[in-house]
């Protein structure tokens, strides 16, 4: 059987620690890889100038029966074009506390389950799930001209 490289789920980062808790949570502590330059969130250009960093805790998709949490430093970089901005992380939307993988999982679940059940299943707040579902509907349906709507049927 082959070894699974769990760090490959989070490109640009290395897993430096893992902690299991009794309440079915797993915490992975990540560290930026030295061979990856941070990129500006606005222009996506690599920049070696790091202003500071903050530790952020984000939610990842469940692994079997365990809730997965990631703890990672998010750096603010001094981009020569854009000024001081947070770095761009491919798998973590800007300012989000949920990874893209977790958001996609929630989007899939809300198509089949009520929001309340998705909230209980994932441990994510009802309002957060509702916002993710609104964004999904906006991208899939687009804007609707309500002036031409005559009836709403449920």
Set out the residue ranges of the language-model regions:
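Short, positively charged, Gly/Tyr-enriched micro-motifs
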Residues: 44-47, 57-154
